[in-house]
Amino acid sequence: MAETTVKKLADIVGTPVEKLLTQMKDAGLPHGDASEVVSDEQKQQLLAHLRKSHGAEDEGSGKKITLKRKSTSTIKTTGAAGKSKTVNVEVRKKRTYMKRDVVEAEEREEAERLAAEEAARIAEEEKRAAQEAAKRAADDEAARLKEDEARAKAEQERKAAGEKAAEEKSKRVSVPKVSATKKPAKEETPEEKAKREEAERKQREADEAKRKQEAEARKKAEEEAARRTAEEAARIAAELEQRGEQEEKKPAVEDDKGSSIVNAAQEASYQREERQSRRRRRKPKVAGVVHGKMKSSMNKQHGFKTPTEKKIYEVEVPETITVGDLAQRMNIKAKSLIKSLMKMGEMATVNQPIDQETAFLLVEEMGHKPVASKGQEELLEDHLAADLVTRDSVDSEHRAPVVTIMGHVDHGKTSLLDYIRKAKVASGEAGGITQHIGAYHVEHEKGMITFLDTPGHAAFTAMRARGAKATDIVVIVVAADDGVMPQTEEAINHAKASGAPIIIAVNKIDKEQADPDRVRNELATKDVIPEEWGGEYQFINVSAHSGEGVDDLLDAILLQSELLELQAQASGSATGVVIESRIEKGRGTVASILVQGGELQIGDMLLAGAHFGRVRAMVDENGKAIKKAGPSIPVEVLGLNGAPEAGEQIQVVTDERKAREVAEFRQERDRELKLKRQQASKLENLFENMGSAETKTVNIVLKTDVRGSLEALTSALNDLGTDEVKVNLVSSGVGAINESDVNLAMTSEGVLLGFNVRADSKAKRVCEQEGIDLRYYSVIYELIDDVKQAMSGLLAPEKREEILGVAQVRDVFRSSKFGAVAGCMVVEGTLYRNRPIRVLRDDVVVFEGELESLRRFKDDVPEVRNGMECGIAVKSYNDVKEGDKIEVFEVKEVARFL
């Protein structure tokens, strides 16, 4: 046999020589050159190493080998143009070899296992059959003994009754002569009675011994059958093992033989059991005769007894439940439950949800016991709370204070924050006003401070309330030249409601009109007393323009935070609050989050209200990417599946499935609440509009840049509605205006409004084609004013009466053509012919109509001025008297405005 070198082995295997040498070196072989010889043992060692490195087991080496062969040849073919070309042909072959003893051993082991299982099953079947037969025999014996005892007792009672009857008869017949000839009845002597009882006892003992012998014989037969079955199974297994070494072609023959033996034994056992049960089968025995009718000894075990008492259930009632589910829990039909609801004055369908209180009343009405239970959402919320408890076990550390800047619009909140941050932010806000919460953290020489800048406009009340809720310290900015304004009072109320400490920053003290004492006096009337006056509020004079007093303000903030002793967990699952959220093209949902505890990292599963998602990226307020954020750090998070509401609590959960379930339940809950509100408003509107004219509506499709602005605009627009004109928000959302928004506006005949967003190319094209009114806004004042103007256009005009002139009747003439004609003097204004008139008598209106004729002398004139005489004929009125006044007026329609 030719020797195999490393190079030849590489050609056979199809591997480069360098790679094969590396693998041989890893396997511990001494080969370093391609010309060295490789033995069979070394090949096996290399193969075992490769199998082990690729995940195969060591014990499998040597049992199975796969060989590949590749040969390359060339053939010449003629193409379509008659030219010949050479084609390379590559033939690949693959064969797998296994040792025969491995296959035989596996087949032998499988056959032995099957035979043992079959034998065990047969033994179990025979044992169970023997036990059942013994049980049936014992039952038959007990029934027989009971029957014998009953028969003997009945016989004794019959004899006793006969003896008693004979004795009474003998007493009644008392003839002395005849009694000498009569033979007395033969009575059983005590000796005979004792002999009879002894014979019966011996018979019972013999029967008992016989029954015990039969039971022992059955037990021995059962053990013998099990032993024979085990011996047969062992014999079959040994025979299979002996034949497995010789037989190679059909290993299944032993299996067939073994299974046939087992099947035959099993069939014989079944036939024997069937014969025994057939012999023991008896007809129902007669227990006695009652009034000439036979009474069966069989018990009526399957007799149905009608329930006489009503079953009372304990019905678990969650917070909301549908009528159908409640009926199913009480085991009644839904129709009866709907009838009970109608009696209570509430109309409902089978699938309509009802609240827990109504369900309690219904359950008590139906006679059952209601029990309050937690819904699935509450259970999930409890699991999340348990996760928070485990996180709270981490030691707390000192954290930076969260400071909210609040105050009236244009009082310099953002400018003050700009000076602290040394950046210009207010210039980027439209109209120079802040329209959503900005979050920033500032590194001061004495510590870090996180600032929240809230809008000062009245429409952002809810946003300011959220800012006060998430804060530790509130800084209220008041302009020294403007004093306390409405939003200043509102900010003070929000801060007091949240319980956060308040610091008053009196801004713009560098102006000539500045009067800090006036601010102190005005705030003192609002129960905000300065410290220097004996109160508890710090007043700091600052100037956002020159920077005067800014350091004092920061020192006051840090001093107040030290008094509060703010603590938070620096590690563990993060919790916080959503400051703002928006949808950006190319980035998706972007949520501004203030971390309040724990550590938020990239890759965490975040649950925010009814939305969830994995954190894909985080950036700080400067746009710089970060990987983690600790307590009191504001960040922007990417990865949520939707834009959450501002103010929603966020929490990091470990399980994505749990986060999805909680988010879906919260969405379903919000949808049900929304439907309930809509249904209630529809019913209210139905009764309000009954008998009145139809209310006009302004349909609006609104898109904004962030959630906070959307909420503020929605609240402001809903407040604009009146009894005559209402605002109907057909759709509202966050993000750019797309084609579906345009189609919605076109269908509802509404106006499309964009606040700090723009429409894409498709939406613009559809707007131009269909003539949809599309408007862009960057300041909230302008949007609200335009909507007011549109609503004013739908208002019915106001009708106003204007008196044009008054004439006094001096005399009354009769005319064949007009009847009574009043000769009048114009005492006020001008009289016009084609105008409505009123006839006043003693300054009381007695007639209202129109002029039929207006003449001066004998000429018809269109008008008569003040101080002139004229003749007036009133149409359809002839009761004009001297001294009356004729008033000419005009009705004008005046446009109304909200």
Swiss-Prot record:
Binding-site list for GTP: 407-414, 453-457, 507-510
Disulfide bond among keywords: no
Region spans: G1: 407-414
G2: annotated span: 432-436
Region (G3): 453-456
GO cellular component, one term: cytosol
Keyword GTP-binding listed: yes
Primary localization: cytoplasm
Domain tr-type G, residue spans: 398-567
Keywords linked to the UniProt accession: Cytoplasm, GTP-binding, Initiation factor, Nucleotide-binding, Protein biosynthesis
Basic and acidic residues compositional bias, start-end: 114-171, 184-258
Xref: Gene3D superfamilies: P-loop containing nucleotide triphosphate hydrolases, Putative DNA-binding domain, N-terminal subdomain of bacterial translation initiation factor IF2, Translation factors, Translation initiation factor IF- 2, domain 3
Sequence intervals crossing the membrane: none
Region entry Disordered, spans: 51-70, 114-303
Localization per Swiss-Prot or TrEMBL: Cytoplasm
Function according to Swiss-Prot or TrEMBL: One of the essential components for the initiation of protein synthesis. Protects formylmethionyl-tRNA from spontaneous hydrolysis and promotes its binding to the 30S ribosomal subunits. Also involved in the hydrolysis of GTP during the formation of the 70S ribosomal complex.
UniProt record similarity statement: Belongs to the TRAFAC class translation factor GTPase superfamily. Classic translation factor GTPase family. IF-2 subfamily.
Protein name: Translation initiation factor IF-2
Natural source organism: Alcanivorax borkumensis (strain ATCC 700651 / DSM 11573 / NCIMB 13689 / SK2)
Gene: infB
